[in-house]
Amino acid sequence: IPLDTIAGYKE
């Protein structure tokens, strides 16, 4: 899973 999306941002 994309942990950066968990953090609340994903470009």
Swiss-Prot record:
Expressed in placenta, specifically the maternal caruncula tissue (MCT) and the fetal cotyledonary tissue (FCT) (at protein level). GO terms for cellular component: extracellular region. It comes from the Eukaryota. The keyword Secreted applies. Keywords: Secreted. It is found in: Secreted. Belongs to the fetuin family. This is Alpha-2-HS-glycoprotein.
